[in-house]
């Protein structure tokens, strides 16, 4: 037989036997009836149906599936005989024999019948007298399991291997393992070292690749796409990244280190810390540059030069870019009316003392360390310290200077102090401050509030494209299912029969 002709042949791998019913059985019971069951056997496998009690025409409709040990082809010398043995169950003693039938599966397959339902006559045992024992109705169907057919080919490939071939494979496997271990270090992410002229540390450069995260999304959501460098530098805050991108000096980076642990340690139970550090980072970028410029170029005439050194974090959001003397007359008068004459006298004295000490601070550099200490302890200071300063205490000296020289102090006291969860303070009316929505980290829209209009449009277009692709994929799956159902209906399986009666499985005998 040619290989092409053999490939076009259909060879079954399984046979499914369904015992439907029996009739005209010999009575063996006491009441003239039988408690009948049938044993189904092919080779060494045996199955048994349930017991149909007290009847001479039992109905079972139970099936059993057998795997053919070899290929069932035409002209095969190997014969496959299916045995059906009908028995009567006895409560006392051995079960009684009612009849048997032997079915040659080769003959059924050679007749090119994949399915056959037929009544078979029950016969006696060999050597016994032949008599009428009734009939049994059986359905025989040949099936092919592609998984079983492919397993034969795999087993044949494994048998052809010799011990020398296995030894050779082991040597190749060691060599492959060695090359894999040598190249496994390639998955470690590399970190680019900065140049000698660079003003930023390696930690800041690694943080540049970290994506922006909204400050209201919850505590530290790290995705699996982060590299090892991002995970190792996760303790660094976003304030240092923003300071590095603007181009500030090393001094500003050291000052902002005190705020680094605030957003990382913030949890859902205390969202105020996280919001505070985020807003102060947005504030400190332009203002710190102005303060450093004043220290370097020696602007002595401005009475508000050293105000930023004594500011706590809650007052740091006040605008200091504009000169307060250039404000409108109404705002200035309303703020100055709240100051008493002794305070004005002390303000002039402190201004003269500050001008005298400014040169000493520039030479010795003590102001820098003093400012860094204030920034480190600024988050824990409360606004109550500003309201009750002690003029005779050196630790409260800068606080008193700020209260006596800042014209916005009276205006800040007049307004309602907002909760620490929202520090976007600006010279606006109280109605605008009340309109600010409370930030809720559990809000689904909180992550989109920080996005611009263009970014929202990009997200919308991206989601529309994803929906379009999903609709196309769903349509393809529906077409595939329709075609598959048509092919199944053409085969007319038993599940599509009208009326459908689900078949029961016959019990299998144990080998013991």
Swiss-Prot record:
Region (Necessary for interaction with AP2A1, RAB11A, subcellular location, endocytosis activity and homooligomerization): 465-512
GO CC annotation: cell projection; cytoplasmic vesicle membrane; endosome; intracellular membrane-bounded organelle; nucleoplasm; phagocytic cup; recycling endosome membrane
Annotated keywords: Cell membrane, Cell projection, Endosome, Membrane, Phosphoprotein, Protein transport, Repeat, Transport
Stretch list, region Disordered: 169-239, 262-285, 361-392
Keyword Cell membrane annotated: yes
Residue ranges of domain C2 in the record: 1-120
Pfam families (UniProt xref): C2, RBD-FIP
Assembly behavior: Homooligomerizes in a Rab11-independent manner. Forms a heterooligomeric complex with RAB11FIP4. Interacts with AP2A1, MYO5B, RAB25 and REPS1. Interacts with RAB11A and RAB11B (activated GTP-bound form). Interacts with NPC1L1. Interacts (via NPF motifs) with EHD1 and EHD3. Interacts with TICAM2; this interaction directs RAB11FIP2 to the phagosome. Interacts with RAB14 and RAB25 (GTP-bound forms).
Reported function: A Rab11 effector binding preferentially phosphatidylinositol 3,4,5-trisphosphate (PtdInsP3) and phosphatidic acid (PA) and acting in the regulation of the transport of vesicles from the endosomal recycling compartment (ERC) to the plasma membrane. Involved in insulin granule exocytosis. Also involved in receptor-mediated endocytosis and membrane trafficking of recycling endosomes, probably originating from clathrin-coated vesicles. Required in a complex with MYO5B and RAB11 for the transport of NPC1L1 to the plasma membrane. Also acts as a regulator of cell polarity.
Cross-referenced PANTHER family: RAB11 FAMILY-INTERACTING PROTEIN 2, RAB11-RELATED
Protein's UniProt name: Rab11 family-interacting protein 2
Lineage: Eukaryota, Metazoa, Chordata, Craniata, Vertebrata
């Amino acid at each position: 037989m040619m290989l092409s002709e053999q490939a076009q042949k259909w060879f079954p791998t399984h046979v499914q036997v369904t015992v439907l019913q029996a009739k005209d059985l010999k009575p063996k019971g006491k009441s003239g009836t039988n408690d009948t069951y049938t044993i189904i056997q092919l080779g060494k496998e045996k199955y048994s149906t349930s017991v149909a009690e007290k009847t001479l025409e039992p109905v079972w409709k139970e099936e059993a599936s057998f795997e053919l040990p070899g290929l069932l082809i035409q002209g095969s010398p190997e014969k496959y005989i299916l045995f059906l043995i009908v028995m009567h169950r006895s409560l006392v003693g051995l079960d009684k024999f009612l009849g048997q039938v032997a079915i040659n599966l080769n003959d059924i397959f050679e007749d090119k019948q994949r399915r056959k339902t037929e009544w078979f006559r029950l016969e006696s045992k060999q050597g016994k007298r032949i008599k009428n024992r009734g009939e049994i109705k059986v359905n025989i169907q040949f099936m092919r399991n592609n998984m079983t057919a492919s397993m034969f080919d795999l087993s044949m490939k494994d048998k052809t291997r010799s011990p020398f071939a296995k030894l050779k494979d082991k040597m190749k496997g060691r060599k492959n393992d060695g090359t894999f271990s040598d190249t496994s270090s390639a998955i470690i992410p590399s970190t680019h070292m900065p140049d000698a002229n660079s003003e930023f540390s390696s930690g800041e450069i690694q943080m540049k690749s970290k994506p922006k995260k909204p400050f209201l999304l919850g505590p530290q959501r790290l995705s699996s796409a982060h590299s090892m460098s991002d995970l190792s530098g996760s303790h660094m805050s976003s304030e240092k990244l923003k300071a590095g991108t603007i181009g500030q000096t090393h001094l500003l980076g050291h000052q902002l280190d005190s705020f680094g642990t605030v957003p990382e340690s913030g949890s859902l139970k205390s969202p105020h810390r996280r919001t505070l550090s985020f807003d102060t980072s947005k504030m400190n970028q332009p203002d710190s540059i102005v303060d450093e410029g004043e220290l370097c170029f020696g602007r002595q005439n401005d009475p508000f030069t050293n105000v930023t050194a004594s500011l706590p974090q809650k007052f740091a959001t006040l605008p200091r870019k504009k000169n307060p003397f250039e404000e409108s007359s109404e705002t200035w008068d309303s703020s100055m009316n709240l100051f008493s004459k002794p305070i004005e006298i002390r303000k002039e004295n402190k201004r003269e003392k500050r001008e005298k000490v400014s040169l000493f601070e520039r030479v010795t550099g003590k102001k820098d360390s003093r400012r860094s200490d204030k920034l480190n302890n600024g988050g824990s200071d409360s606004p109550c310290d500003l309201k009750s300063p002690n003029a005779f205490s050196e630790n409260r000296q800068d606080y008193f200077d700020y209260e006596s020289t800042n014209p916005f102090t009276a205006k800040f006291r007049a307004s309602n102090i907002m909760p620490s969860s929202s520090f976007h303070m600006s010279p606006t009316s109280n109605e605008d401050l009340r309109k600010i929505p409370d930030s809720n980290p559990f809000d689904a829209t909180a992550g989109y509030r920080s996005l611009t209009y263009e970014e929202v449009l990009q997200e919308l277009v991206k989601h529309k494209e994803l929906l379009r692709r999903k609709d196309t994929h769903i349509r393809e799956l529906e077409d595939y299912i329709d075609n598959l159902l048509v092919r199944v209906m053409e085969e007319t399986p038993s599940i599509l029969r009208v009326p459908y009666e689900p078949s029961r499985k016959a019990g299998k005998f144990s080998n013991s």
